[in-house]
């Protein structure tokens, strides 16, 4: 992902996570997200989606990325202002809009949030089982 401070004159800076040596899992990964995937979870989603074996499923993330700049006020209060723009590797900004999944699933329907969560988990298991069966046929 990339970070930048708007109107600062400083260019956007790419952020990378470098792979370490040793054993790595390279099999399929389903990343389950929803509207309660926020902030650091969204940064993790951006990073994981860059991997070829990861598929995001579930709901669109919250769209609340930026870290805050906290400033104390004379009366003792603290004001916190969003001060960064975080984008995907291609420059797309997901602030407010969130990151839409590749495979949409309703995670927490208003009429049955717990049941919806378990239905989404079961669907994820079905997708993993289908992908495993497909790979075994190769």
Question: Which ranges hold each PLM region?
Answer:
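Extracytoplasmic/secreted cell-surface and envelope-processing proteins
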Residues: 38-44, 65-68, 90
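Active-site-proximal beta-strand/loop segments in catalytic clefts of secreted hydrolases
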Residues: 32-36, 58-61, 82-86
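Second-shell loop/turn segments in exported
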Residues: 18, 30-36, 106-114
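Gly/Ser/Thr-rich loop/hinge elements
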Residues: 1-28, 66-72, 83-87, 93-94
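Extracytoplasmic/secreted envelope proteins and their assembly/folding machinery
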Residues: 26, 41-45, 49, 97, ...
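Intrinsically disordered, Ser/Thr/Pro/Gly-rich linkers and terminal tails that flank
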Residues: 87-138
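Short, well-structured beta-strand/strand-turn elements
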Residues: 38, 51-65
């Amino acid at each position: 992902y990339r970070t930048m401070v708007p109107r600062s004159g400083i260019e956007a800076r790419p952020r990378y996570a470098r792979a370490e040596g040793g054993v790595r899992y390279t099999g399929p990964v389903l990343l389950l997200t929803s509207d309660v995937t926020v902030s650091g979870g969204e940064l993790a989603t951006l990073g994981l989606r860059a991997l070829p074996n990861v598929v995001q499923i579930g709901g669109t993330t919250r769209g609340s990325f930026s870290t805050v700049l906290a400033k104390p006020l004379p009366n003792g209060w603290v004001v916190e202002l969003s001060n960064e723009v975080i984008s995907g590797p291609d420059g797309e900004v997901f602030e407010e809009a969130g990151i839409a999944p590749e495979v949409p699933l309703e995670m927490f329907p208003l009429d049955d949030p717990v049941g919806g969560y378990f239905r989404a988990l079961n669907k994820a298991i079905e997708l993993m089982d289908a992908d495993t069966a497909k790979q075994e046929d190769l």
